[in-house]
């Protein structure tokens, strides 16, 4: 259930250590950017100079910061920022943010994806700039946040290059999958209690690139469940998806083998035809640079099925 709550929190703001550098840690100035580009403003955040002590409480933002070359400016990331491996992971939490612990890092910029416990207001009282980068609903949201992070950190050219590269790669992948007359259906699993994500979510929008029909849509037609409904086994079996995608392999130990062993699932087409795709939980729950890998995984699965 914790994974489901994580997904819902992210959608309404979209999935889930050792100690990092302390507040007295000297950071080397970032290269490849000019201080002449400052001051800069993104939304309500203005940076008079390039930040050198960034704290990221959002795994996606952490991935973006390192992808655009701002890694040397990051002094601490939250406990869910598992990538890249050299990110300064700490016990800081984006789900239970502690203003005092964050301030102890002496940050000149904090990045969050959820304003839980009014952390923006709390840090504002401490005069700490905060960029709110909520969960993307569509790819354009992801591209916009990458651009914002590039602007605030002094890496505009790098962020622009990353967005262009992502757009090009995704476009090439999607166009490389042959069109089909009849849409394939799929079930996306958040956890084994049958929570899923509908087409209204960011993850759903990725599958929609391939014209796939989401069997979870019927369980949340008006979006009252924030795009993350729990399906009944009866409904899922009746929907008979052509494909099953598992986003609970790392968290919950699910695999094609465990799905095949589930009672009553043997008649589902995806199970009968061995079309169960194991995804990396982290990649499947974030909206940063590695979304390209997710798009490729979906493309590979679809391409294997004769049109």
Task: Locate predicted features.
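Short secondary-structure boundary segments
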Residues: 58, 114-115, 135, 190-192, ...
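Short helix-initiation/N-cap motifs at beta->coil->alpha
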Residues: 35-41, 90-100, 221-233
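Bacterial Sec-exported substrate-binding components of ABC uptake systems
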Residues: 1-60, 157-187, 300-307
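Alpha-helical, coiled-coil/dimerization segments enriched in small aliphatic residues
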Residues: 79-83, 88, 200-227
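Extracytoplasmic substrate-binding proteins
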Residues: 119-195, 225, 274-307
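Proline-aspartate-enriched helix->loop->beta-strand connector
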Residues: 98-112, 128, 232-246
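A short, structured surface patch at a secondary-structure boundary
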Residues: 53-115, 212-215
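A ligand-binding cleft/hinge motif common to bilobed small-molecule-binding domains
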Residues: 117-125, 238, 242-262
